[in-house]
Each structure stands twice: as C-alpha cells, then as structure tokens.
Amino acid sequence: MTDKINNLINQWLKWDKNEITRKEIEQLKENNNEKELLVRLEERIQFGTAGLRGAMRAGFSCMNDLTVTQASQGLCEYVIETIEQSKSKGIVIGYDGRHNSYIFAKITAATFKSKGFKVYLFSHIVPTPYVSFAVPNLKAAIGVMITASHNPKNDNGYKVYWETGCQINTPHDKGISKKIDENLEPWSNVDATSDIKYGNGDDGESMIDPLSVITELYNKNIKEYSVGSKIELANEPIVYTAMHGVGGVYAKKAFETFQLKPFIPVAQQIEPDAEFPTVTYPNPEEGKGALKLSIETAEANNSRLILANDPDADRLAVAEKLADGSWKVFNGNEIGVLLADWAWTNRSTLTKGGSTLENNKYFMINTAVSSAMLKTMSEKEGFIHQECLTGFKWIGNAAYNAINNNDGTTFLFGYEEAIGFQYGDVSFDKDGVRAAAIFAEFALSLYKKGSSVQDHLESMYKRYGYHISKNRYFFCYEPSKMVSIFNKIRNDGKYLTKLGDDDDEQFTITRIRDLTTGYDNGYPDCKARLPVSSSTQMITFYFKNGGIATLRGSGTEPKLKYYVEMIGEVKSNVESTLTKAVELVINQLLKPIENQLEPPKDD
C-alpha cells in the first residue's frame, strides 16, 4: 500500500466518527483494495450549483456523515461572510424519506447551531418545494434540502437555496466550495447525536419547527391559482402516486385547498419507503414502466388520469387513458406547453390585483433543451419568452430577477423538459405539489366539456404547429469518456455540416451552438449569448428543415442526453422526420457502439 493511500486512510479515520463508514474503509485496507480506496478517498465529492449528490458510502468522494459535516461547515462560513445578519435570519433545513436523510439534516442543523444560527428544522419529511418556499417566507438567509430527488435508492444529496428561495448559482458554488476546503476538519463543539429539542430557537439550544406554519402559508398562497370556483369541473376520479416519496400528504392537502375530490392513491407507493421496492428507478419520467402500478390502480377504479410525483415531489408526470383504451404518458414538453396554455388562459389569477395586463407585459421561461413550442406560442400570443440554460437554478433566478426589476412585467410560468414546472411566483423552483393540483383542475375542466388532455394538446398543435420531440439518454459512467465524445463531435472546430445522405438536404446544419466552448455561428461574431461553462458539455444543432438537436452531459447523473425536436403542420410528416433525425443523431454523432455507451434497460 503506497504512502499516499495510507495518508488518505489515516486522514479519513482521524475525522470520521461513524462506526459503519469507518469499518468500510478499514475493511478495504485489510483487503488491500488499493483501487477502491483510491476511488473512495483520492477525490472529494464536488460541491456545485446542485450542491452535493452521490452514493451513500464511506469516502471523501461519497455522501456520508463526514462529507455532509464538511459541506455544512463550509456553507456556514460562506453564509456568515456573505449575507448580513445571517445568524439571526437563520437557516431552513428539510429532508426527504431516503436512508440517512434525517441524520444528514441533523448534522447540518447542529453545525449551524454551533455558530449561533437560528435553525428552522422541519420535524417531518417534506417536499423539496417547501424548503424553497420557506426560505423567503421565513426571511431566512439560506436553505438546505437533503434529497437525491429521483436518483437510485443508494444515493443522497445536499441542495442549497439562497435567501431568495432560488437554487444557488455561480459564483456562490465556487465560494462555498472554497470554504469547504478551508474547513475540512470537523469542528469540536458540534453534537449531532442528541435528540432534537424544539422551541422558539432563542435559548441557544432549541430549534424551530416550521412545518405547520409553512404548510398553512404554502396552501394559502397556491389557492390563488385555483379557478375551480369560476368554472365547471367533472366529477371524475384521479389516481395519484408519490413513488414511495414524500408527496402523499402534501398533494392531499393541495387537493383539499383546491376543493378537489380526494385522489385515489396508488396504495403500494403512497407511503415513504427508502427502498423504493416496486420500481427499478424511482423516476416517473421513465414512463410506463415506472407507472405500471398507477395504471393498474386507474384501470381498477375507472380513472383516466394519473398524476405522479417523484420522491421529493418537485416534479410531476401525467398519464391519460385515450379513447382507444391505451395509456399515453405525456412527456415534459407536452405537460409544459399544456400548463403554459392554462396559465395564459387564466393569467388574471397570476396578476397582482387580479386584473389583466397588455399581452407583452407577461413572460414565460423554458430551457434551451425544452420545446420551441413555447417560443412559437409567445410569437403568436404576444407574451415575452425567455430561454435559459438547463436547470431550475436558471429558471428560478431568471424569474426572480425579472420580477424584481420592477418593469411592470408579470411572470406566469417556467418549465424544463425533465417534468419540472414553476407555475406562478409562490416560490422560485420546480414544484410538483402545486403542479399536481393545478393540472388536476385543468384536466377536470376539459373532461366537463367532453374533451381530454390529449384532445386539447392536439388543438394546440393545430394552432401553433406540431412540435414533436424525442428525449432520451445513454449511460456514460466515465467523465473523461464524456469529454472525449464531445471533442470528437467538435473535431477541432470542423463540425459536421449535415447529417444523412449526400442527396438529402433537410438535415443540412444551418447553425451550431456550443455552450462548452462559447461558439455560436447564429450570430455575426460567432459568440454564444447564453452563459458558457467549460466544465459542462452541451452542443445544439439547428437543421435546414427547422429541426433542433441538442446533446448534453447531465450534471447530476452519469447520462449523455439527447433532445431532438421537429416542427411542421402535418403530424405524420413530423413524426417520420423525427424518427429519422433521432436515428441520425444516434448513429452519426453519439455512436453508442463505438463509444461503448449503455442504453437504458427498458430500451
């Protein structure tokens, strides 16, 4: 065993106080497993704009008591240095139902308490959106949510919200990361093992439980978005699944707030279960495989609508039984434009004072990998459309900044294709709880009129043109391979000029935007207008036929994602062109066999 590895082992054993993770490292040492020890100890888990996310096991590169302690110490010091009166403003801490989430939350709470912070620690598991909502409403300095969202059961994460209630963005991530590196040794005066004492938080020992206050205030705020008292709704059953996560009781409360008939829960998945026993991936975005029990429940209860939250309830999936008896799982773009249309129709409920402004005083946002249909809608209806980078750290901050510019504009809606939706400005992050209640009301209004969600989507396509997309991914477990694949596509700046056969002009590439290098030949100076990041891989190709294809490395999972969209007036033509485009993107750009990329198991 090398001196380097021995030094890393000794450092870990000096700092780690958890017997389970200490034994993991000791066992690896005893087995002389140098390779695994290097994987666990050589690199530190990186703190980025998404905070931390990784597998729960021993080692500096993983999620465990020690790395959460170190992250909390660094965050604490950064907040003290950056936000005035941060200790009296306090920190809000929430956690989901995963293994170790409560323990990690206690560590975070004890760390901040040791520095004299007021600590709001939820007494029960909560949806991620509750923390985003709670931070500004409690006038706190910072928020932390312990969750790995829809990741596999062995993962966990540490998500940070700024005092605005928005996810942190650059440069905060770099500042926090630097402070973590300066505070690696656990502070001696922190005790995270004692039982939590709740009180008013003023005695230097107790913590404040914000659960009842925030639950009441949150539902009071989202009630403003309900239009059920003004329109007729069908009396039809709706099936809901929490996907073994936290959403059940909170979605139930949101339905009650909207005065909707109680949903029918998927019994096997309504209670939190850290093992996620009924699904391979606890991710409703995976489609019919993840929604198998939901469909069975719906069939048994004569329901044609399924609403599904992911485990931390910040995202929403939707499925509907069609007239032919088959089930359609709507993708994120379809749900996004449907909710955008609902927000546009009911924009007075999203306007302060309940009045209606000029069309160009409203704005909506979606991400660069989401459908161009929202932009098409904006051009036809006259509202402002803004495009931003992938992730709600961009959408939330863009919405917050625009609202606080005081230029008379009103934010209506923002979404990303990965089934994340922000309806209104109750909070500035994606929220599957309020989205579920809002979508239920929308769907029931359609059913009352003899229509359906799919029928309404078709009517939107007739108005704005068919915008049909295919988004999928391959697993890419090695970061160096991800970079290599994208660099091969760049070909030292000599990008492909077309896809397909020489005599097929429709896939001639008319524009390339590379947000890793900052190149965008859609502008005279060939400089990208969206923010550029050399540490993330993302290239978009625009085709002569109006189609768009984006390739992107995920920031939170080992996935190389592709997003392809075709636009046109005739559905069958758009669908066939999309099928061909996806095939070309996979075979000519991604080259999964050559690059040894692993497809999803259900493909």
UniProtKB/Swiss-Prot annotation:
It is found in: Cytoplasm. One of its GO terms (cellular component) is cytoplasm. Keywords: Carbohydrate metabolism, Cytoplasm, Glucose metabolism, Isomerase, Magnesium, Metal-binding, Phosphoprotein. It catalyses: alpha-D-glucose 1-phosphate = alpha-D-glucose 6-phosphate; O-phospho-L-seryl-[protein] + alpha-D-glucose 1-phosphate = alpha-D-glucose 1,6-bisphosphate + L-seryl-[protein]; alpha-D-glucose 1,6-bisphosphate + L-seryl-[protein] = O-phospho-L-seryl-[protein] + alpha-D-glucose 6-phosphate. The active site is at S149 (phosphoserine intermediate). Its main location: cytoplasm. Mg(2+) binds at S149, D310, D312, D314. Alpha-D-glucose 1,6-bisphosphate binds at R53, S149, D314, R315, T390, E416, K430. The modification Phosphoserine is found at S149. Its EC number is 5.4.2.2. Belongs to the phosphohexose mutase family. This is Probable phosphoglucomutase-2. It comes from Dictyostelium discoideum. The gene is pgmB.
